[in-house]
Regions:
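Conserved C-terminal guanine-recognition region of P-loop GTPase G domains, centered on the G4
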Residues: 45, 69-142
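Extracytoplasmic
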Residues: 178-180
Length: 180
């Protein structure tokens, strides 16, 4: 299974990648561009899966080469990096901005996991996140908290990934080619 690791810049995405892969990564480029990608392996149960760390992205409506790479991969099932599952890392202390991007990913209708990272920063700021409300807002998405910098939440994330592959939200994302 290919798992795409996505999120806004500075959400701790690389920390989650390193926590899940144990720093086992390969750096390469996406075909045709100079944007780096990191690929690592994670073990879920008895199976080994590929985790692809994509560049930090604010939106599926690309404004940079990095965002264009993410858009191209996620909207083209024939792309060699097209994922079976998407994991979005969100900064729990800045959830509104991060949920904007997650809502776009969710609307693709692909199996997805939302990891609320940096819970300690959110708590110090006096923020309490109601995960049940998030699950109501995004039915079919798997949602969990973590603090990758401290190494907490790894087993819960792996469990979510194992169970999320069969959950598929209804797609609300339309490409122009589907309409015209």
């Amino acid at each position: 299974m290919k798992i795409a690791l996505l999120g806004n810049p500075n959400t701790g995405k690389s920390s989650v990648f390193n926590m899940l892969t144990g720093l086992r990564q390969h750096v390469g480029n996406f075909p045709g561009v100079t944007v780096d990608k990191k690929v690592g392996e994670i073990k879920i149960g008895e199976e080994t899966h590929m985790l692809i760390d994509f560049p930090g992205t604010y939106s599926l409506y690309p404004r940079s080469k990095d965002e264009q790479v993410v858009y191209d991969v996620l909207t083209d099932p024939s792309n060699q990096d097209y994922p079976d599952l998407i994991m979005v890392i969100a900064d729990a202390s800045n959830l509104e901005r991060n949920l904007f991007f997650f809502s776009q990913i969710y609307d693709l209708g692909m199996p997805c996991v939302l990891v609320l990272n940096m819970n300690d920063v959110a708590q110090r700021a006096g923020k309490h996140i109601n995960i049940e409300k998030l699950k109501e807002a995004f039915p079919g998405a798997s949602i969990e908290g973590s603090n990758a910098r401290l190494g907490t939440g790894k087993e819960r994330i792996l469990s979510l990934l194992e169970n999320a592959a069969d959950k598929r939200p209804e797609s609300k994302f339309l490409k122009g080619s589907e309409i015209c």
